[in-house]
Amino acid sequence: MKTCVAAVCGMFMLLVSCSGSREFKPAFNQPLQPVMQPGFVYVDQVAPLVKTNLKYAGYDNFVGRPLDGYHGRRAILRTQAAQALKKVSEDLYRQGYLLGIYDAYRPHTAVLDICKWGADEGDQKMKSRYYPHIDKAKVFGDHYVRDFSEHSRGVAVDVSLLYARTGKPVDMGGHHDLLDPSSATDSTLVTPSQRRNRMIL
């Protein structure tokens, strides 16, 4: 099975995302009303300081369209993961930051949709923004994407930082879903300031 590299932040399994300076807006505005399984919660009900912008519910992602299974803008996690996220968000707020979520629970249908996209070599419309320095065939082979995700268990999130005062993204030297060596947390391809920002997470 093919696997990908995920940056995991401590016990909370926070997948670090490198956010650029684009404004943090919800990707999709239709309310999400899934059948909530026992042990899962909406993140905004537990951690109100967390700001959500589900990229896979819209078009600003490496596939270039909403993924199967995403129908709204409310993030879902297992209860314990959401409670851990609440503690992290409160600590960051005291430092002048907000925690922004790009992805949380990911339906398995979305994972299958990503695999389907990966098999279509002709679909290269998002290459210049999301994987400019690698061939699409290596997106899976170089471990950027995998055919199983901890997101589907509701215990992982893609996150970045926002300034609490303005709501603007903190400069991480990249953007969410940038499939590139520079996205590695400790990459030397970004500036020292951008690396310091990453280390906050």
Residue spans for each PLM region:
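Positively charged n-region of N-terminal signal peptides that target proteins for export
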Residues: 1-4
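Bacterial N-terminal signal peptides
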Residues: 6-16
